[in-house]
Amino acid sequence: FYSDLGKHKIGSYYGFLLFIKLIIEQKRLNDFTRIRGTFEDFIYQYSFLIQQIVRKYRQSKKAYEHISKFYKCIMDLLIENNNLDIAQIAKEIIKNEEFMYLKVDLVDNEEVQIKGNFSRGKKQQIKLKTFVKSIPRCPICNGYLSTKSTSVDHIQRKRDGGNNSIDNGQLTHIYCNTTYKN
């Protein structure tokens, strides 16, 4: 929920909270877990679409419900079309009447100068790009893992003959290990 310049994006945060609330109420957490990795990749690569939604509604407080609908649209498209790649999902989103105004083409406005210094913003983007590559992923849902809330899981389950060796352990999301996997 941070921009590539490291600033907090309140609209994204509120929109995601509402989205999660709705999928819990609709008992669709397992659906979300199934597509979580691709969902997170999409949000990372197309974060500028959320900025466009906020701009349309002029402030985060007015935009967050639309951002929640945007997240739900992504989830539904990924579930219905699990063979589409992220760019194809972006093209499908703008077929939805509510999101036709979004410009989904990735545009590179970077000005490159020989012997030029990195701006503060570019430095932050380089850090983010580097750190995101190194974030571990949950082997069950392929979503990013937080260092603060993980579960240690048996790769081969105990009931299937799995042992307690280090080689038979993996870090997962708590939900993936305790609820989704079972």
Stretches found by the model and what they are:
Residues 22-26, 132, 161, 178:
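Short, well-ordered loop/turn and helix-capping segments at boundaries between secondary-structure elements
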Residues 1-97:
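A cross-family structural signal marking well-folded subdomains
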Residues 25-32, 87, 98-105, 135, ...:
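Extended hydrophobic-aromatic, low-complexity segments
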Residues 4-8, 114, 161:
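Conserved aromatic-histidine-acidic binding/catalytic patches
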Residues 15, 171-175:
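Generic recognition of well-ordered alpha-helical segments
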Residues 93-140, 163:
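Short, charged surface segments at domain edges that flank catalytic/cofactor-binding sites
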Residues 120, 126, 137-172, 182:
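Histidine-centered nuclease catalytic patch
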